[in-house]
Amino acid sequence: MGLCSDPAITYLKRLGYNVVRLPREGIQPLHLLGQQRGTVEYLGSLEKLITQPPSEPPAITRDQAAAGINGQKTENLSFSIGINILKSVLAQFGAGAGIEAQYNQARKVRFEFSNVLADSVEPLAVGQFLKMAEVDADNPVLKQYVLGNGRLYVITQVIKSNEFTVAAEKSGGGSIQLDVPEIQKVVGGKLKVEASVSSQSTVTYKGEKQLVFGFKCFEIGVKNGEITLFASQPGAIAMALDAAGGVMPSDSALLDEGGLLDLEGF
């Protein structure tokens, strides 16, 4: 959805991550997404598709350090796009009303996420769980997204952060002077606001919530009459986990080739 040349987005996509346009809580491994007619919708947890689970769901490993993603920056975004992302992020912390007035001199905005953590589940474990489980064949989600015209995906990893830095520029690249104490008043006590030592136009926001800004997912489909997990190259299914639980390639599915992904239903 635009911004496809942005190096940060391209970098995350190259690692197999879908980049969430409006970072938020609530996106977790083992949650399902349905894609139909260009829209991606949140559908709920994988367990709701299972009538008789063979065992406990695959274990989720939480709060792993994501050093390879930490500190990645977007390129300069237009003010209208950048300020909407900032307002959405701040709203997740219960703050941000009126923040656009503090950036009224800005024409470009750039984001950087720090303290990035990952929650993940092993795709092979998910595939094995699906193979052994009894799936609800009458579930409308299965009929619509697996047997119908849609596509069904299960999230296997999310990347999240509670700290992000916003750099603002005037038209032509000049810096602006941001009033950090005033910004702190606007966001209240739910976020800590700090100015960069090197630039008054760069501000870091830090809160307690971990907001998800990217995720990996694999497609759920049917092979030889059985529900199974597929690994997808961007835009096409590459291969499936075989009945013996063989090796699965690492390529996860990219749901939007254009850039940032909008999720419906959260």
From Swiss-Prot:
Changing F213A: 100-fold reduction in toxicity of pore-forming domain in E.coli. Palmitoylation helps stabilize the inactive state; may self palmitoylate. Palmitoylation plays a significant role in pore formation. It comes from the Bacteria. Keywords: Antiviral defense, Cell inner membrane, Cell membrane, Cytoplasm, Lipoprotein, Membrane, Palmitate, Transmembrane, Transmembrane beta strand. A lipid is attached at C4 (S-palmitoyl cysteine). The keyword Manganese does not apply. The chain crosses the membrane at residues 69-85, 97-114, 163-180, 189-205. Residues 238-266 are annotated as: C-terminal region. Changing C4A: Complete loss of toxicity of pore-forming domain in E.coli, significant reduction in leakiness of liposomes. One of its GO terms (biological process) is defense response to virus. The keyword Cytoplasm applies. Disulfide bonds: none annotated. The N-terminus has marked structural similarity to the mammalian gasdermin N-terminal domain. The C-terminal region wraps around the twisted beta sheet core, probably stabilizing the inactive state. Belongs to the bacterial gasdermin family. This is Gasdermin bGSDM. It comes from Vitiosangium sp. (strain GDMCC 1.1324).
